[in-house]
């Protein structure tokens, strides 16, 4: 039985919502695959993926089926009890990664909060209270809680909230010498994104990530990889650390892991996990049956040779066409990234104008993303159809052509 809802419009946002977002001027109401329809029935191609979340597009049948089945059985019991979907998903993550233990939560910020707390707890338990310093990268992004925004290397997000959490420093990304100079015996963790997402879709260099691993080993520090944006097939591997062959001690995952349903996880080893004894950390909703049922369906679809190989092929399809557009119109100078996390770096003449390109794309019925003011970001579904890629890139080129005419 359908329910009749009161009509709402984009203007209502400004009347009832806290103004910390500035959403587009249209409201999406329906999605299927890599297409989205707004209230007026306009059809858009989605290259944004809900900011790298809708890893299987909109309303994928496997996810709809898993959610519907679980919704008819059990929604929530809290972590006073466990549940079957949680245990099934945890086992699949353990079987597919370096990890031996999993902590579920609801968002990337929560997963990183757990990761950073665990790193400090391990150091405290093993080496004493003086070993608590965390080193992260300039322009990194790890969430919006007070702890995670302090670890993030972007003052525009962390300033203005009173004293920041102490013991956190930042060094330039991909600068191994700077990292060597920063790490000491007081360092409890080095926190890195294998691919900086919000910082401009900047992949880590192999020798940099290998060097970080070596430094952590030499100083009894933990290597924490934030794979909130790069994980769950986005790079063409289940997790980006597999692309580099550099294994972290702790890994955070969110966004794609739930395919659009709020879900996140912290992965680690048994040896480290034991420092989170009962009551040391927790969450009410984390690992709820609905989220984990969807997460299990996500990993079942993604973690196959066909899908992961398809990501690599689709990357090349995007890269070839985007480089051609860049050469023809002179709007961007570099196409970078891994898999289906792709960034176009704007040329000097267009620096600071990513929002203009975002708006021009929307006018051509295309949903894209920014990664700061100087980079256009694409994070589409990993199973996006070739025809949708072609059509979306045609619309993108029309937007660029109109801007530059």
Curated annotation (Swiss-Prot):
SUPFAM superfamilies: PLP-dependent transferases
Pathway given in the UniProt record: Amino-acid biosynthesis; L-arginine biosynthesis; N(2)-acetyl-L-ornithine from L-glutamate: step 4/4
The organism's place on the tree of life at top rank: Bacteria
Note: May also have succinyldiaminopimelate aminotransferase activity, thus carrying out the corresponding step in lysine biosynthesis.
Binding of pyridoxal 5'-phosphate, residues: 108-109, 141, 226-229, 284
Family from the record: Belongs to the class-III pyridoxal-phosphate-dependent aminotransferase family. ArgD subfamily.
NCBIfam families per record: arg_catab_astC, argD, PRK01278.1, PRK05093.1, PRK12381.1
Subcellular location: Cytoplasm
Binding residue positions for N(2)-acetyl-L-ornithine: 144, 283
A single BP term in Gene Ontology: L-arginine biosynthetic process
Catalysis: reaction(s): N(2)-acetyl-L-ornithine + 2-oxoglutarate = N-acetyl-L-glutamate 5-semialdehyde + L-glutamate
Name of the featured protein: Acetylornithine aminotransferase 1
Assembly, per entry: Homodimer.
GO CC terms of this entry: cytoplasm
Enzyme Commission number: 2.6.1.11
Major enzyme class: transferase
Primary gene name: argD1
Pfam family, one: Aminotran_3
Presence of the UniProt keyword Cytoplasm in the record: yes
Disulfide bonds: none
